[in-house]
């Protein structure tokens, strides 16, 4: 319950942060897709902990094992199972949270719902759950690149009150990965890194915004009413840990425009594809992709687990204080970039198969 996502291109993730491992079962991947396992590992390397001075110091290789569904480098069309073993757990760092709820963390709500919780490491609420999503998203990415040349690139747009202005039409993954904060604006990236370090040294945390662009998306993805493409994109990225907001296209800023200013005028094209003079719609109209770049933004809250002492209650409902130990990101955004890309790729792959199944018979 609650650990599966997708309709035809469907994933189910499993595992806890301090259990034996985490992983995913992917169903619905088309057969005979030439799969590059190094590309899967590369995405996990972008997500893994301990990669820089502004991420958690937990050391995990996050080496993926493909257990089924692939033979001689080709997908079989059968379920693809992948697992990553946990190696660097420290349950002793979580003694305090075994009896006191972390403010704004899932501890209290998991306990209220289930009457039990995996408090060491956060269990299913830990960002380690996203390993399976990133691995499956890497397969979706390869499928979309092969079929349509689709390119999904995300980057850190804002950290705290520092915001970068990035041209979504030209930004490259190489520019994003050129620094540890994953902001393609080098000058702003340096300021963001300094800000994260300063806040982390104070025992605190900060949030921000990730922006993501889909270039060369397939046309016609999405369905009317409840399965609109932007609705599924919102559900996908909002299921990631620490997310608190979603925008597409002009987003909330579009409310300041008049219809005559906001409408994307259609233009003639030589190839018969839809072209627009602007892209306030963010590449989706009526819930269906129009072929223009899809542009979304995702807000991430400050990391809930911090070293600063906070007011809370214990498991008996009594007032107490908590200064959390353990190894935690002072800011989740640098490692969340591949997570956002993965969820976008998964949604697009799923809707592509649904589009092919319904609308490509004749």
Swiss-Prot record:
Pathways involved: Metabolic intermediate biosynthesis; chorismate biosynthesis; chorismate from D-erythrose 4-phosphate and phosphoenolpyruvate: step 7/7
GO BP terms in the entry: amino acid biosynthetic process; aromatic amino acid family biosynthetic process; chorismate biosynthetic process
Superkingdom classification of source: Bacteria
EC number of the protein: 4.2.3.5
Cofactor: how and how many bound: Reduced FMN (FMNH(2)).
Record flagged with keyword Lyase: yes
Co-factor requirement: FMNH2
GO cellular component, as recorded: cytosol
Binding annotation for FMN: 124-126, 286, 301-305, 327
Reaction(s) catalysed by this chain's protein: 5-O-(1-carboxyvinyl)-3-phosphoshikimate = chorismate + phosphate
UniProt keyword annotations, A-Z: Amino-acid biosynthesis, Aromatic amino acid biosynthesis, FAD, Flavoprotein, FMN, Lyase, NADP
Residues annotated as binding NADP(+): 47
Its job: This reaction introduces a second double bond into the aromatic ring system.
Assembly, per entry: Homotetramer.
Protein name according to UniProt: Chorismate synthase
